[in-house]
Amino acid sequence: MNKKIDLYSSSYSNYSLETYSEVRLETYGEDYGQTSWVSTEESHEIPELLQLTSDSSVLDIGCGSGGYAVGLAKRIGCRVLGFEINESGVKTANALAEDEKVSDLVKFEQHDASEELPYEDDSFDAIYSTDVLCHVPRRREVLSNTQRLLNPDGKFVFSDALVIGGLISYEELENRCPDGLYFFSPPGINEQLIQESGLKLLEARDTTANCALLSKRWHDAREKRKEALIACEGEENFLGVQRFLAGVHRLTSERRLLRFLYTCSK
């Protein structure tokens, strides 16, 4: 069994280091603290799918280091509440909101997405969650929570990067699970759970090609900065992350592991 690696906590805690910023910029074409499979084009389209305006109240499920939520507040002027189970992510996110002078619009809290959330019914105009639900054991509860929290005219966008598309070996599955919890979905299960939660599916879009491209860019950007990254995270962790990214690229480029973006309404 491969030793688990630190993928997310190290990225969150090293968010402000120049080397990690360079990796993100080379991977995505812009830098707001990304650690997901959201392409730049997709990140720009999400506000349109959510129909955001300056009056919108938005919930970010699994906000990571908060960069995307902060960017929404700066670009659109909407109010964003983000939550994240990782303590380092929440700490980094709130510090970023202060630094970017949007703490009046953006707030971050620590919660578990699969637990009952302390927010009122119909309290958000838009909810989004990028590549998070595949780490949550009770996906049905998350979707039911979302249906409860979304106002009657609201939109919900989420992505799942772990939809099974073909034969995958035990070793490949193990490599695809570097740290934390990972849940792989058979085709059609997300559509089924969306319907059972009371949400309406508007679109299910295959974005696997973006995942294949980003994983290759991410791997190569890190490889160029090998010495600096080893100094930050250690050689064993560096090599583990590189194996992970190479594995993601292989599985997605061969379409044995798929990613979908789902747009829903209440």
What label would you give each PLM region?
Residues 161-181:
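Short, glycine-/aromatic-enriched active-site segment of Class I SAM-dependent methyltransferases
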Residues 1-27:
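N-terminal, positively charged/glycine-rich alpha-helical extensions of SAM-dependent methyltransferases
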Residues 205-266:
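Conserved Class I S-adenosyl-L-methionine
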Residues 140-155:
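A short glycine-rich, Lys/Arg-flanked "PGG" loop and its adjoining helix->strand segment in the class I
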